[in-house]
From Swiss-Prot:
Domain of life where this protein originates: Eukaryota
Catalytic activity: N-formyl-L-kynurenine + H2O = L-kynurenine + formate + H(+)
Keywords: Cytoplasm, Hydrolase, Nucleus, Tryptophan catabolism
UniProt-annotated location(s): Cytoplasm, Cytosol; Nucleus
Pathway(s): Amino-acid degradation; L-tryptophan degradation via kynurenine pathway; L-kynurenine from L-tryptophan: step 2/2
Protein name (record): Kynurenine formamidase
An annotated Gene Ontology molecular function: arylformamidase activity
InterPro entries: AB_hydrolase_fold, BD-FAE-like_dom, GDXG_lipolytic_enzyme, KFase_ver/fungi-typ
Compositional bias per record (Basic and acidic residues), positions renumbered to this chain: 1-14
SUPFAM superfamilies assigned to the protein according to its UniProt record, in alphabetical order: alpha/beta-Hydrolases
Lineage: Eukaryota, Metazoa, Chordata, Craniata, Vertebrata
Chief site of localization: cytoplasm
Length: 294
């Protein structure tokens, strides 16, 4: 039995309010600090890398990519697609280039994906957009040596949905070598009755078809060659931690999948991803090792 079904609305909302669980500062301050850290990191990245900003991947106004390109003559150039968090209703690609700071030095291309957050976009739209963004990246950058995904929070959900795509409906089948799913939500049912769903307006049917936890058989078909890292913060809420643990167990018990769980000490929902600006950070090192760039 899922614990969340026994919770009253207040407790459920608290469980799915990551800012309430940081040990570093108040809820309001941790969000302000998070946005500042992402913006400052992205500004640094734009100063270090060659950038191609607002590259279209579709017809929509919000369907744009920011590309951070290393100065390298190497033919071994991996590419990481980053999908931002913000509960499908905040943030944008404009503050999502921070992880390029350590990666471009190592000859890695970083692509930050824009998608139409709620209320403009709904869950089906966002999932379709990020899938199409991957197809577009492969078509534009066919020379890369490997394709990797990294997503945080809502972005980890979207990355997991990409891994669970039936690519027969698309013009190409991406060979995704690795994916970092950081503090994500993989079962959308618990958030249906919370404040998170107010702008999203998901029905149970929409939540089910967009829950990676329901799509593990499709992920096995599409992404069996992908190294998957499910990362969770020590100070994520118990329900956020359970989301990662349950999704990891579902993948780990599926024959033929390569998955590890990283329980990152001394982190909360926000600095677990902010620290990817640092080349010495544990998850940065893991990502570089996965790409053969450590």
């Amino acid at each position: 039995m899922s614990r969340w079904k026994d919770m009253n609305k207040d407790e459920l909302e608290r469980q799915f309010s990551p800012s309430q669980w940081s040990h570093r500062m108040s809820a309001d301050d941790v969000i302000k600090s998070h946005v500042t850290a992402l913006k400052e990191g992205t500004e640094r990245a734009r100063g270090l890398a060659q950038t191609l900003l607002n590259v279209p991947y579709g017809e929509g106004e919000g369907e744009k990519l920011d590309v951070y390109v290393p100065t390298t003559t190497s033919l071994d150039v991996p590419l990481v697609i980053y999908l931002h968090g913000g509960y499908w209703q905040f943030l944008s690609k404009e503050e999502s280039g921070f992880m390029a700071v350590p990666l471009v030095h190592k000859g890695v291309v970083v692509v930050a994906v824009g998608y139409d957050i709620a209320p403009k976009g709904n869950m089906d739209v966002m999932v379709s957009q990020v899938r199409r963004s991957v197809v577009s990246v492969i078509q534009q950058y066919s020379h890369i040596s490997g394709l990797y995904l990294c997503g945080h929070s809502a972005g980890a959900h979207l990355a997991a949905m990409i891994l669970s795509t039936d690519w027969s409906q698309y013009s190409v089948t991406p060979q995704i070598k690795g994916a970092f799913l950081v503090s994500g939500i993989y079962d959308l049912l618990p958030i249906l009755s919370t404040y998170v769903n107010e702008p999203l307006k998901m029905t149970e049917e929409v939540a089910l078809r967009n829950s990676p936890s329901q799509l593990v058989p499709q992920l096995k078909l599409s992404s069996s060659n992908c190294d998957i890292v499910v990362a969770v913060a020590q100070n994520d809420s118990p329900e956020f931690r359970k989301q990662s643990e349950d999704y990891y167990k579902a993948l780990e018990s599926t024959e033929g999948l390569k998955v590890t769980l990283e329980d990152v000490p001394n982190t909360d929902h926000f600095n677990i991803i902010e620290q990817l600006v640092d080349g010495d950070y544990h998850l940065t090192q893991l990502l570089l090792k996965m790409m053969g760039k450590s």
